Amino acid sequence: MATPIKVGIVGYGFSTKCFHLPFILPNPELHVHAFLQRAPAPDPASPSDAPGWGHCTVDFPGAKHYRTPEEFFSDGEIELVVVCTPSHEEFVERALEAGKHVVVEKPFVNTSAAADRLIALAKEKGKVLTVFHNRRFDSDFRTLEHLVNSGALGDIRDAQLHFDFPSPSWVSGWTRKEYQPGEGMAFGLGTHTVDQALRLFGTPASVTGFLRSNRGVDSDVDDTFTIVMQYAGEKRNLLVTVKTAIVTPLQDQLKFFVRGTGGSYVKFGSCPQEARAIASPGQPATDPDFGAEDPRIWGTLSTTGEFDAASQTLDAASGLHVGKYPSLPGWYRGYYENVADAVRGRAEVCVRAETARDGLRVIELARESHVRGCTMPWS
């Protein structure tokens, strides 16, 4: 086997430990080589003194530990940098300037203009630049994408993509009145669902946004949003709605409600991978059932013609073939499998930085629409 790609990770907190390392470590083509963590290493005799989410020297004693960006980006052995810090733009730029390939957590950066600049730099340097939109590898979205691409639903006319989250604890810290680019739920959970919409349907002709603060404070920083994407040409009859609500008293949250000329798909409940990764102790991503959904939350597929005889029966009243359609397994490991292939030149990167940039632009236009009270043309 070829020499593994040496990975350097910027940051050592929740994101690194729960969303990246569990899916990097099982990949034999990736080797965790170094960390940039500003905190000093704890005394080996007192590893419990490590800060917050721990310290890389305790968990990865064989990896290099750098405390300054200058040292980290000067390591010529690092091929791939994974940026997991709250702020991204500076580290992405420094990684590209140092000749590294880059994976950056979502949201890509705070503005589409900054994204354009980094995309141009990556092209200039001839390096892979991709954004961690792992939700493309959710069980529910993989299933929806399969149904759409296979034609099971016919021509899609209405698609609602949700990422609802009842009373999330983290929004309690959003107390400032004024909005700054990159803040709010649309730039948080919304970047995932907007990315899913772009993956399925491409860029819209126009965007309309409705932003709300439902956490009990007077703030322009949204915790609830609805983004409506309208299309043109052959897709002029398509309406796509992307939503997040925090007031949502449901046992299982609505994920997808998609209707087309050939059928519909309604899905409640979420992909189990995140919950299993962040549990203590977490379930290893290598477990065969790591991405398997509970059949109780499989989505309901209704089609005008029989699509899957094993899961559908004919409903005499409606004339539709209806049944619980088995969800494909979630596969977050697929994200880093694709990254390794792209770095080695065997494949195109799945999550293109240009698509992530378009997602930022959708959110920018949604906010402009909300402020101005009108629909904004794509630009």
Feature map (PLM): residue ranges:
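N-terminal Rossmann-like dinucleotide-binding module
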Residues: 1-60
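C-terminal helix-rich "cap/oligomerization" subdomain common to oxidoreductases
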Residues: 4, 29, 36, 80-82, ...
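Active-site loop of classical SDR/Rossmann-like NAD(P)-dependent oxidoreductases
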Residues: 15, 45-48, 252, 323-336
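A short helix->loop->beta-strand "cap" motif at the edges of active sites that frequently abuts
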Residues: 62-63, 98-100, 125-127, 234-238
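Short acidic low-complexity segments
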Residues: 63-75
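Beta-strand-loop-alpha-helix segment that lines the small-molecule cofactor/substrate pocket
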Residues: 79-80, 86-136, 151
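Predominantly a Rossmann-like dinucleotide-binding segment in NAD(P)-dependent oxidoreductases
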Residues: 135-219, 373
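Contiguous beta-strand/loop segments that form the cofactor/metal-binding neighborhood of enzyme cores
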Residues: 188, 194-286, 333-347, 364-365, ...
